Amino acid sequence: MASALHLGLYIGPVPIAAPAELVHAVSKVKVDEGSGSSQSGFEITLDLPQRSPLRTIFLVSGGGGGVPLMRVTLTVTLNGRTESLIDGMATNVETLPGEGGVAQIVVKGKDLSALMRVIELPGLPFPALPPSVRVLTILAKYAALGVIPMVIPSIADVPPLPIQRIPVQRGNDYDYIQRLAADVGYVFYLEPGPAVGTSKAYWGPEIRVGAPQPALTTNMDGASNVESLNFNFDRERKKMPIVFFQESASKAPIPVPIPDITPLNPPLGAIPPLPPKIEQLADTAHLSAPEALMKGFAFAALHSDSVFGNGQLDVMRYGRLLRSRRLVGVRGAGLPFDGLYYVQTVTHQIERGAYKQSFSLARNGLISTVPQVPV
């Protein structure tokens, strides 16, 4: 790899720096970063001799024999700045035939949320605990793994009265937390870092504000820093939900349209597709007003985007790592598509001497809402 780029590999139940022999055996690395509530995953390909003890260690630990948790952490240092790509666990190990006494080992895994699906505790009661406190209680079990909870209570975060209802957990920890998030229109995911061996467990609304990443530049000759960048405008993807409140005296349903603009999800495009499709959420009539609003906001957030982009870049040309779940600027794509976008997915593809990223972008409409983007 180039001298300005360094790949760090940490393995073990408590992640420690891998020996130089193992790091030199890495031939390819692939890391997938999503958005929303999607899990991150990784795939590491190693070239090891047939009789190497490291080959046996990976097969035993990845298969769950003897080692309860094969933790894998990947970091990248670019121009003196270190970032964690993934902090997860190996879930699958494959062997591929090679030549000259060398075989390939492919280690696949997911972030630490995969560990939350291992053990189920059905029927665990949470008396008088609102959803946010239930999430904190569940995540406390993973503090020893460096999981740092970041939980934002919703407007419907009301503790149930024990004389009326006692919530109980159904299914494993991950599925139950995701269910609680979906009920109020939130997302739940684990993000590696800031330090090796730590991960942030975020349970809250999807955030589309903050300082944008340096602009992706296309069609500007020597200033271009992407290899490809394409855009698509799909007006049928945008939908406006209508929730129903039940009037207490007459029991008549009152329809209320919910916009897709919130303080944490401001418009990134000046001209959205009009008129949007209307979607009636009839199942909200029996909910309380805060719960119905959260359902509407969640639906609106999922169906607010109509402009989509995808492309590929060379990290050394871009000068830093592009990360998902953040904003990024675009310039050189023309008046309808320039401006700020939300990064939905990023796929890191690392090989000896090359570091590529494939990405997808999204926003709510055409034409930028800002006069310029940071470079």
What are these regions (language model features)?
Residues 1-116:
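Assembly/oligomerization scaffold segments
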Residues 14, 47-49, 77-79, 89-96, ...:
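Solvent-exposed coil/turn segments that connect beta secondary-structure elements
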Residues 37-65, 223-375:
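An acidic/polar, Gly/Ser/Thr-rich interaction patch typically located in mid-to-C-terminal regions
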Residues 43-44, 109, 119-150, 166-191, ...:
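Amphipathic, non-transmembrane alpha-helical segments in extracytoplasmic/periplasmic proteins
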Residues 55-60, 96, 117-120, 147-150, ...:
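Sec-dependent N-terminal signal peptides of Gram-negative outer-membrane/periplasmic proteins
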Residues 104-107, 111, 151-225:
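Short beta-strand-centered interaction patches in the first periplasmic/extracellular domains
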